[in-house]
Amino acid sequence: MSLSNAPLGQHVAYPSQYDPGLLFPIPRATNRASLQLGAALPFTGVDLWNAYELSWLDARGKPRVAMATFSFPADSPNIVESKSFKLYLNSFNQTRLPNAQALRDRLERDLAAAAGAPVGLEFISPQRFGELNMAELDGIYIDKLDIEIDTYEPAPQLLQCAPGDEVEETLATRLLKSNCPVTGQPDWASLQVRYRGRPIDRAALLKYVVSFRQHAEFHEHCVERIFGDIMRACQPRQLTVYARYTRRGGLDINPWRSNFESAPPADVRTARQ
């Protein structure tokens, strides 16, 4: 489907009843072709979506609320356009369902159909809200490095290795900003780079991350671009790239890509989320 047909950036009436047809899939292959990524991906991964505004009516018409985490596998054929996801979730607001399991069943079925692959779902009831924690990404934060930069479109040539023996370390920054490719709205994120290999020059990495500041691309695609650029520039033996984007429309998106870790990290929101 063409992005010109997506709800994002258009005035769309909010639905009053459940409508799975609102979900708008976008093929991953379109963007991956520009990154020279084929069917054999150099990573595994998942896109973790957190929904904070989930509500429906029970069988007697009383509102119910919950939160949910959705796990879209990185090898699924499609991503789901975020505004269409928001509208779809809102279509449950005035929909009567016999119980929470009926909601789960519809969510799992509809999202799998849109993504082209099974989608994981963790349903968080109000009884568990008090158990939820907040934490920052692990790692050595590079934000205080004294750099000068005037490049605000992705510049992989900025990346370079530092002298020294092979290291195993985790670097992090809160300075990633990209932009929605449809509306131009800013997307803010914290980024974590975990690797084993020649030392990555930290100032160079920070400049590279900042260079996304005027770039227009979906969250998932930005993370895959970062992964590929680091692999080409520094050739680490092991690499994980993880971004946690701030929420918009009651949803946050957190793409994770790795060539050595088999399980995604715990889905713990950061302070800005």
UniProtKB/Swiss-Prot annotation:
InterPro entries the UniProt entry points to: GTP-CH-I_C/QueF (IPR043133), NADPH_dep_7-cyano-7-deazaG_red (IPR050084), QueF (IPR029500), QueF_N (IPR029139), QueF_type2 (IPR016428)
Residues the record marks as active site: C180, D187
Residues that bind substrate: V80, E81, S82, H219, E220
Class of this enzyme: oxidoreductase
Compartment(s): Cytoplasm
GO biological process: queuosine biosynthetic process; tRNA modification
UniProt-recorded Gene Ontology molecular function terms: preQ1 synthase activity
Pathway: tRNA modification; tRNA-queuosine biosynthesis
Superkingdom of origin: Bacteria
Reactions catalysed according to its record: 7-aminomethyl-7-carbaguanine + 2 NADP(+) = 7-cyano-7-deazaguanine + 2 NADPH + 3 H(+)
Gene3D superfamilies, alphabetized: 3.30.1130.10
Keyword NADP belongs to the record: yes
Enzyme Commission code: 1.7.1.13
Binding site for NADPH: S82, K83, R248, G249
The keyword Protease is assigned to this record: no
Keywords assigned by UniProt, alphabetized: Cytoplasm, NADP, Oxidoreductase, Queuosine biosynthesis
Any one GO cellular component localisation term in the record: cytoplasm
Homology family: Belongs to the GTP cyclohydrolase I family. QueF type 2 subfamily.
NCBIfam families: QueF
Function: Catalyzes the NADPH-dependent reduction of 7-cyano-7-deazaguanine (preQ0) to 7-aminomethyl-7-deazaguanine (preQ1).
Quaternary structure annotation from Swiss-Prot or TrEMBL: Homodimer.
HAMAP family xref list: QueF_type2 (MF_00817)
Name the UniProt record assigns to this protein: NADPH-dependent 7-cyano-7-deazaguanine reductase
Gene name as annotated: queF
